[in-house]
Amino acid sequence: MKLFKKLAAAVLVAALALTMVGCGAGGTGSAFDLKNEVLNVIEDSYCADHKVATHTTAMDAAAAALIEKAAADEAAKDDDVTVKDLLRNNGTGNYIAIFMPYGQLSTELMQYLYIGEMEDTLDKAIQYIANEGYYNNSDTAVKIGSPVIGEDDSIEIGAATGKIKDKNYLVLLVKKAEA
């Protein structure tokens, strides 16, 4: 009977540990979760401000294509070329790209801070859309083409994760929603 109780306790502890840390692709702490959390926070924030931010798979695909093109660019081998340059030079269309490297964000606090920084960068990027100085000095925002987005405009958003210059990046693409 004692052996059974010890075995049952060990199984319970193992089950609790697995549910707390998550495991496998798409589990807690994965890039997939981070991407979706960023998108959800932006949609919720816009909704709270009585504006509309719509996540679309087309925007996700555009973000993924941008990452692939930037990573494959021969200029990526040059240490003097930044990720910002690669994104700007390989994008088509009229977007704002918000990009940040991410490592293993193993705590909810670190994920919260990362997501908050992405959201804050997006707010500033839209607020200062006409200010080239903002974009020249920003390490995490770049204009692709000539985006025109007002602070009260509805937006379309999409995101993807991928490796550029040997670092993992989350790239959020934003454009003015078509009426």
Question: Each predicted region: which residue ranges?
Answer:
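Short, well-ordered surface patches within globular domains
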Residues: 26-98
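Bacterial N-terminal signal peptides that target proteins for export
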Residues: 1-11
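C-terminal motif of bacterial Sec signal peptides marking the signal peptidase cleavage site
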Residues: 18-22
